[in-house]
Every structure is written in C-alpha cells, then in structure tokens.
Swiss-Prot record:
SUPFAM superfamilies: Cupredoxins. GO terms for molecular function: copper ion binding; oxidoreductase activity. Predicted to be exported by the Tat system. The position of the signal peptide cleavage has been experimentally proven. It comes from Pseudomonas syringae pv. tomato. Residues 367-434 are annotated as: 5 X 8 AA tandem repeats of D-H-X-X-M-X-G-M. Induction: By copper. This is Copper resistance protein A. One of its GO terms (cellular component) is periplasmic space. Keywords: Copper, Metal-binding, Oxidoreductase, Periplasm, Plasmid, Repeat, Signal. Cu cation 1 binds at H100, H545. Pfam families: Cu-oxidase, Cu-oxidase_2, Cu-oxidase_3.
Length: 609
C-alpha cells in the first residue's frame, strides 16, 4: 500500500539520495538495492575515525555537513564487553572537535568534553581514546564541540554482552533518529535569542478561540488567553525548533527515502532505537506490531509490551517485534507534531506500508507545568516578571560560533540577575491540600526565570503530552524496571536538589537560575551515594545527562526502579535518582537539548577524594 506524503516531503526524500562522496576525503557510502544507504559498520578493538566536512543535499539545497568517516550518521561501532578498545580520532576540520561516548563508563580523560575532560582535538590533530569496555547494550557517540552534533558528528554504538542476554531474538536493526536543518546552527541560535517562538508555526488562531469559547465558555477562554499572554508563553510551544526548519531523519534518510530493514516472517526482530537528535523528542510506533521493550539506555529491563514509546533526546530503547505481514511502517513523529521520521520493515526491498497521519497537536496546560489548583484568573502579577533584553547575550561574541568555544566548558558565557517576585498574584489559597514546592533563593528576583512549578510531581506513570488517552498502550517510566536490584544497595547519605530553570521569551536556560559560567561545581566525595532531586520549573521538557556515572531512577517512595544515563524531565515534574560517585575527576552534567546546553543549562560535577 502506498503512503501519502506532501510534495515537500517527497522532494526532501529524493534530495537525500544526493549525498555526495565529499571533497576527496571520503569513500562513497554503500547503497542497498532499494537505493537506501546502509550504515557502515566497524567492529573489533582498533578503530580509525576521521571527522571532516561533507557536501550534502537533503532538502533540495546543497549544504555542508560535518561527518565521521564520510557517513551521516557515522559508522556503527560494535564493541565487546570486557575488551579494551583503541579509537584514533583525526580532525580534518578547520575548528577543534571532540567525540563523547554517550553513557559509557570510562576514565575522565576519555570522556571527550573540551574544557573538562581534555583540551579537544585541534585542526589536523589526532586524539587516541583507549579504555576498557565495562558494559553492554545500545549507545551512541557524538561531538561535544560547538554545534557539530547538529550538523552530523554522531553515530550509533552497540556493545555485545559477555554473558547471555535475558531474551532471545533472531536478527536486529539499529534505528538512529536525528534532526537536520539547512540553516547554520549559529544563525538558528541567533534567531531563537531574538524570537524564541520563531519556529512555532502552530500558534492558536481565531478559530481555536471560537472553539474554546464553545467548549469552555467566554470567561474561561478569555482568562486562559490573558494568563498565557501575561506569562509571555505559548501553550503550543512544545519544541523550540520544529519541522519548520527540521527534516527528521531515520538512519540519515528523509521520510521518502524509505529506509528498509529486512526480516523473515515469524522471526523475533530486535530494534535498537537511538535518539541522536539535537532538539527533537520522538514518539515511536509500528502500526500493526506490538513492541516488547527489553532495554533502556543500554540496561536490561523486565519485558513490557507497548504500542508506542516516547524517546527523549539522547535516550536509547531496545525492543523486540515479531512481524508476520510483508511490510510495516516505523513511524517516529516529533513530539510537537510538526513532522516525522519514517522507515519500513519488510520481507524484501521496495515494499512500503501505510504511513499514519500525524496525531493532533497537544497543548501545554497549567496542570502540566505543576500549577494545578491555581486561581489562574489572579495571575496578573506574573506580568511583572522582567522580560527585558538579555544583557548576557553580548558576551557570546555575537553568536559567532564561539559562544562556548569548542564547547570548552571552562569558558561558557554568562547571564545574571532575576526578578521573580511577580508570582504574588497567584491565589495560593486555592492550592489547599497540595504540598507547595520550595525554590532556591537564586531563583528569586531573577529576570531569567519566568516561572516556578508550585506542585510538581514525579509523573512516572504519565505517558506525556499528546500521548494520554490515545487508545494505544504507551510506555511510561513507571513501566521500566531493571532486571537487577540496586547495584549499590546503600541508602543515599545526602540529597542534592536542583531546579531546571529558564525564560522562554529570552531563550535563557540554567540550573537554579544560575548559568554555567556563574555556577560553582557540584562537589561529590569519592565513594559516596547521593540522591539527586530534579524539579522542572519550566514549560519545556528536558533530558538531563550526567557523564561518567549511572543515574538510578527512583519511584515516589524512594525505591530503585531503573538504571539510566539520561533522565527525561517533563514540565512540572519532580524526579529523584541515586548516583554512586565512583569516578574521580571532572564530569559534565547538562540538559541534552543542544541549544539549551549552549545557553547555560550545564554544570560541572567534580568527584574528589
């Protein structure tokens, strides 16, 4: 059955076939019989990787990507648990570069974060990464320098287990989801700083107002619009960067390129999903197939059968499916419903299955943001929040690509000051029976914090915005349970609470209202077990990643649930996890939305004796 797609999407698909060999530096990618490029695979213990520019044509316009070994994505690396791997990374760019091995436990000087782990790889230079592989599962790797991840410096990573895995399968495919823009990422960032909702082409219309009046009444609808206007936010702004500029790729291919993964009817097929995008959350389903989730972030979980799952930026999920028909669509729609990545599982090349329409666009509500129970008619005071010009912008070298030089996290730019007394207009008496969330003093009177969650909750059993009550079984964090008990076993000796903060209009992001350059490192004592509590004081969803150590997610009662390397934090959520400080050194800790990290949602963690 043929799918329906727009002409624009079709052109993108055809244009993606024009990926070139590139500047004499690269071999041409291999192509399957259908015209779909195959992932290059490198395995063993010795690897040579080269990062350089590569001309591409994904949307009908010629652009320059940065690529690893001439591929977009880079080669699939296959390691074996227990081996020592050596990776020689050569920089053929005109700028410094780096490779970070996401979720991999290794020495700090092998972690690949310029300014913390090492100095970076200068143009023409070579850096040799060497470390023992201590884990197994599905991971990925990417640049931690500037915006290089956005323009192609990333690739998938699979580590074969030393011991038998707790499930059986017959064959497998790696499915890496990414987002591509023809814009210069520096220009894109400038645009967000000038107008943070520039890429939101789905603002509410007069027609929406009329419909809301019919559903909710005049007074409630006017109060709702007034409240959002005073907060200088938009309930349709689920993603800072949308399909207005992004083309969503599956294994480097636009939707109409029809990436195809072959299977034999009746076999058990393992799919290793990786979200390697810069900014995009994806909701994944395969119409006609149940997915049995068996691993999250490379770690085995008790099997759970679902129809759909949301994958945060930087997360990985392994699922097993048992296809019997000739063809199925792998459908990954963006969380804001502005586009999708798509591929096909089929018994032979050239087949397609029906592509479902995008789901309705969700809206963020006050309840979503942890504001449940507020008298929203009394929020006039929120208009007092300082939404003036961002003085810190001038420190970013006019966004000339070196706002965080090569992501040198010892030199990130500054923003300071806050005005937060404006929350006085809220009717806190309307929140009787709720536990009011406290907030750090650094958020008060801070012009770079535009909201605070009043009653955040863990939301572990919440499918998320746009996925509730959709008639499908959707994976939640409450469904995830590691196949092992808490590997440490100790109760945390202390708790560290951090708030995810930001200002939508100014496109400013931070922890506790303090940008990275103004923040002191978080100090952990070597060997201690700590509990980290995160509170999301923004209307955005943030994937939070700690380098070098595992994040052991807890339930609301403080019981160990699942081991992760990236913790998804929806709006209005409060989640806790345990960390064993077993890795001496300096480590990055940040939001994995690239432009949020670039704008300051980043901290250094130091593990000291």
């Amino acid at each position: 059955m043929e799918s329906r797609t727009s002409r624009r999407t079709f052109v993108k698909g055809l244009a993606a076939a024009g990926v070139l060999g590139g500047l004499g530096l690269w071999r041409s990618p291999s192509w399957a019989a259908s015209g779909s490029p195959a992932l290059s695979v490198l395995s063993g213990t010795e690897f040579d990787l080269s990062i350089g520019e590569m001309p591409v044509n994904i949307t009908g316009r010629r652009r320059t990507a940065m690529a690893i070994n001439g591929g977009l994505p880079g080669p699939l690396l296959r390691w074996k648990e227990g081996d020592t791997v050596t990776l020689r990374v050569r920089n053929r760019l005109d700028a410094a570069t780096s490779i970070h091995w996401h979720g991999i436990i290794l020495p700090p000087n092998m972690d690949g974060v310029p300014g913390l782990s090492f100095a970076g790889i200068e143009p023409g230079g070579v850096y040799v990464y060497q470390f023992k592989v201590q884990q197994n599962g599905t991971y990925w790797y990417h640049s931690h320098s500037g915006f290089q991840e956005q323009v192609g410096v990333y690739g998938p990573l699979v580590i074969e287990a030393k011991e038998p895995e707790p499930f059986k399968y017959d064959s497998e495919h790696v499915v890496m989801l990414t987002d591509w823009t023809d814009e210069d990422p520096v220009s894109l960032m400038r645009t967000l700083k000038k107008q943070s909702d520039y890429y939101n082409f789905h603002k509410r219309t007069v027609g929406d107002f009329v419909n809301d009046v019919a559903d909710k009444g005049w007074a409630a609808t006017v109060a709702d619009r007034k409240m959002w206007a005073e907060m200088k936010m938009n309930p349709t702004d689920l993603a800072d960067v949308s399909g207005a500029t992004y083309t969503y790729l599956l294994n480097g291919q636009a939707p109409n390129m029809n990436w195809t993964g072959l299977f034999r009817p009746g076999e058990k097929l393992r799919l290793r999903f990786i979200n390697g995008s810069a900014m995009t959350y994806f909701d994944i389903r395969i119409p006609g197939l149940k997915m049995t989730v068996v691993a999250s972030d490379g770690q085995f979980v008790n099997p759970v059968e679902v129809d759909e799952l949301r994958i945060a930026v930087a997360e990985t999920f392994d699922v097993i499916v048992e296809p019997t028909a000739e063809a199925y669509t792998v459908f990954a729609q963006s969380m804001d419903r502005t586009g999708y990545a798509r591929g096909t599982l089929a018994v032979r090349e050239g087949l397609v299955a029906q592509v479902p329409p995008l789901d309705p666009r969700p809206l963020v509500t006050m309840d979503d943001m942890g504001m449940g129970g507020m008298d929203h008619g009394s929020m006039d005071g929120m208009s007092g929040m300082d939404s003036g010009a961002d003085d810190g912008m001038q420190t970013m070298s006019s966004m000339g690509g070196d706002s965080m030089p090569a992501m040198d996290h010892s030199k990130m730019s500054t923003m300071q000051g806050m005005d937060h007394g404006a929350m006085s207009g809220m009717d806190h008496g309307a929140m009787g029976g709720m536990v009011m969330q406290s907030h750090p003093a650094s958020e008060n009177d801070n012009p770079l914090v535009d909201m605070q969650a009043m009653s955040p909750t863990a939301k572990l059993n919440d499918p998320g915005l746009g996925l509730r009550n959709n008639g499908r079984k959707v994976l939640t964090y409450a469904d995830l349970k590691s196949t092992f008990e808490d590997p440490d076993g100790r109760e945390p000796s202390r708790t560290i609470e951090l708030h995810l903060t930001g200002h939508m209009e100014k496109f400013a992001w931070s922890f506790d209202g303090i940008k990275f350059a103004d923040a002191q490192p978080l100090i952990l004592k070597y060997g201690e077990r700590v509990r980290i509590v995160l509170v999301n004081d923004t209307m955005m969803t943030h994937p939070i990643h700690l380098h070098g150590m595992w994040s052991d997610l807890e339930d609301e009662d403080g019981n160990f649930r699942v081991r992760k390397h990236t913790i998804d934090m929806p709006p209005g959520s409060k989640r806790s996890y345990r960390v064993t400080a077993d890795a001496l050194g300096r480590w990055a800790y940040h939001c994995h939305l690239l432009y949020h990290m670039e704008m300051g949602m980043f901290r250094e963690v130091r593990v000291e004796e």
